[in-house]
Amino acid sequence: KFGFASYSCSSDVDLALEVALKGENGVAVIMGTGLVAFARSGETLHRTGGRGYMIDKGGSGFHFGSDAFNCAFEFIEGRGGSETILKLVEKRFGKSLESSVAEIYDGGASFVASFASVVFEAFMLGDSSACEIIDRNAYEAAKIINGARKSLGNNENRIVICGGLCKQKEILYPFLEKYIDGDFLLEFLDEPIVNGAISLAGRINKC
């Protein structure tokens, strides 16, 4: 149907690199539930980040969602926070946040990450706490991107971001832009990572 032979891919990393870079050099950044960057120059590949939510500090969907919960509880407890974020979180749950704690822990990292969108929705409503959350996470994401580029001597200017947070590219771009070092070309890719398998098979079939 696709006009090429079958191909067995070794890992999701191969697919992400292919769909982001299409066999070219650069930095591929996966911003989904977690966050990891891969810098490639020829046959050299360097990984930065992606150590999991118990180690990494921010920039992932999990951290955006976790920050939303924390911000909401801060408001409940009179420690600052955001009433807007609290209302959006409770709207998603359909009940009070205080009665939803067990559900949060039962849901795990991917469930927490699903609340990342709340932060961006609050930002669009002009919420200052949401702006702070985005800025802080963009800073952490940029540190990982900068580390990946440094591993290759900052010789690769192309940075391609893929994953679920690409849906927020219009908001994320200016926040990331101010923290990424040097000259760069930043792209957000909406294409599903699984398409990397099709692209890889097509290129290999031409060899």
Where would I find each of the regions flagged by the language model?
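ATP-binding/phosphotransfer module of carbohydrate and carboxylate kinases, centering on a glycine-rich
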Residues: V19-V27, F69-C207
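Phosphate-binding/catalytic loop of phosphoryl-transfer enzymes
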Residues: K1-E83
